[in-house]
Amino acid sequence: MQARRTRLALSALAAAALAAACGGGSGGDMGSSGTATSSSAASSKTVLPDVFALEPRLSREPMNDIMTGELLPIIDRLFDLVRAQGLDTELQGVKVFAPNSGDKFLPGKVAIGFSYLLLNSSPSDPKYQTYLDGYRAIADMTIDVVNETWGIYYYTSALWKLKKAGYLDGPTPAVNPATLELLKTKLDWRIFVDEANNYALKNGLPTNYYGVAFSIARLRYLLGWEDASGSEALLQKMINHYKTFSAYGFSDETDGSGRFDRYSILLIGEIWQRLIETDMQVSAEDEALLKGWLRQSVDVIKLRLNPAGNGVDYGRSLSAYADTAFCEVLSAAEHMNVLTDEEKEVAYAFATRVAAKYVEFWYDSDWGSLNMWEKGRRTDSYRGKARILGENLSLSHQLLYTNNLWKASGFAQKKPMATPQFVQYLQALPSSTLTKFAGFDGQGATYDRGLVTYRDGLRVISLPVVNGAATYHRTNPYFAIPHSYNMLSGVADTQWPQLQPRFTFANTGTPQVLIPASYQKNLQTQASADGRQLQVTWQQDALDRVAGTGSGSQPFKDTRITSSTRFDFEPGQITRVDTYTPSGAQAISKVELEFGSFSSDVTALGGNRFSYASGDVTGFEIEGLQDCTVADVSADTNYNTPGGALKTSIRCSSPAFSFEQPLTIKWVLKYRSGSIASFKPN
C-alpha cells in the first residue's frame, strides 16, 4: 500500500519541474485517416512522480551513449561466445546453430549484428584484429547454415555496409573471396519470389516480404551482382500493393482481409529505411505517395507516445519489436523531413527511451541475453527461444541503424528533451482518435477496420477493430477489446475469451464455437466536447466460427448470431455493452468470458462484482452471465503476455440454454485514472 500511495502522490520535485518546463506541442491535424478530439490534458493537468520513477533510467542520456556504453558491449560478448564455441554455440540452453533450431534467418542476423563491431572500431582498437579474423571465420563457418528471406536481406545489408567501409577489399578482407562467391548465389530474392509469375510471393508469405525482396534486389545491384531491373520491378510491386490494399495509407498484411497491426504501421518505415540505405531514387509521384503514407504512420505513432518507450500493444510479433517499430518509422521520418522541428525532438526523446528500455528491461543481465520467453514473458511461437541469438542481434541492429540516422542529423551527443517538457507535449495530444484503415464506405458488404486510441492523461488505451485473418482471427491479441501496457493485454497464440464472450453450441460432434470477431461494420465514435468521454459503436452481421465444422485457419462467417457493440471510455472507467441476437432458436451449451489482469488481491463483492487491492485495475463487474470465479493464473504460461505474467483471471459463464431472445452482456472495468504504464510491469 505504501508503494501505491507514493506513486499516486504528486511530488514537489515533479511539480516544480513541470512549473519550470517550457515548450510543448499539439496533436495537430491527424490527416484523412483519423478524427481527433481535444487534448488529453483535459483529464490530467499534473504529472505524477510515476513519470520519473517508471521511465527507463537511461532515457535522459544521449541515445548514442546507450549504443556505445551498453549495446555494443552486449554484441561483443555474443561475438566472443560464437567465436569460441563455433557451430556448437549454446545460449541459455539453446544450441543456436542446430539444424532443427527453427531460426531460418540466423546467418544473416549474425552477419549484420557482428558487422557493427567492425564498423565501430578502427585498426588502433585492441580488438580490431580479433573482430576482423573472427568475422571472416564466422562467415566461413555459417555458409551452409539455413538462411532465408529476412536472413538473406540482413546478410546482403551487412556486406554492403562492409563494402562501403572497405572491409571486403585488400589482402585480409572480412569475408574470404571464395565465401563471398558462394554468398552471391545464396543471397537471392528469387528464392522466395516467383519472378515469372508477376513477382508473386511464394509459400503464402505476408505482403511485408515485398519490402524484403526489394531490399535484397537493390543491395545485390549495389554489390554488382545483378542489374537494376529486379529492384525496380519489386519496388513498383510494393507500391502497387499499398495503393490497392491501403485506402487510408496503411498496408493490409493480407490481400484485403483486413489484418492491420504492427506491420501496417511499420512497413512504410521499412520501405523508407531501405530507400535511404541504398540511396534509391524514386519518381516525384512515388516520393509524394511514400511520404504521405509515412506521415500517416507518424500520426498514429504520435498518439501512442508515452514516457516509458512502450510501442504497439496489440496483434502479433510484439515484445521488443513493438517498441523498435516506432524507432524505425520515426527515424526515417526525421531523415526525410516529414517531421516538424518540434516533432524531431519528441521523436528522438522517445527513441532514446526505447533504447534505454531495451537494455534495462528486455536484456536480462543474468542471462547475458535478450529475454522474450521466460520469467512471465511470452511471444509468438515463430519467435520461439530457439531464435535467441538471432533475436538478440536483429533487435540490436534495429537500434543501432536507427541511431546512426539520428547521429547523421546531429543528435550524436545530444541529450533528449527533459522529461517535464516531453510530458507536456504528450499531455497536449488528442484525448481520442479513430484511425481508419479500411472500409467506412457504407456498403453492405464492406467491413470497417480501424484503431481507436484513448488517452487518459499519460495512459494510452487501444481499441483495435481489425480482422486477424488467417491463423490470428481467433487469438486474443487481435480481439476488438481494450489493450494498454501493463494493464490490459492479450497473450500470443492463445484463444481464451479475454473480455469478449465465446458461444459454444450444443451440437453433436466437435462443438461449434462462435466469437464476435472479423465482421465489424458501421464503426463510429462520438466524443464529448471536453474529450473526456468517448463512445465507440459498431455492429456485426455475423460472428466468427472458430471451432467445429467449417472453421479453420480463415474466419468463417456464421449468421446464426448477430451483434451490436458499444464501448464507453471515461477517465478511470471502460464499459462494454453487447447485444447478441439469434436468428431463430439456438441450442447453446455455454457462454464464457474472462478478464485476465495484471492486478491482484481480488475481493468478490457479490453480484459478479470484484475489487482489486493491488495494480492499476481497481474493479470489474459483469452482467448477463451467471457465474464468475477468480483464478490465480500467475504461474500459467497461457497467461504470460509479451511484457510479463498476468496475475488473476475472473472467469464468467452461463450454462446450457435455448437462445431465442436477444442477450445483453455488459462489463465495467475501473482503473486508476492517471496511472502511467511503466517500461516494465509493476
Please tell me what each predicted stretch does.
Residues 9-46:
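Bacterial Sec-dependent N-terminal signal peptides
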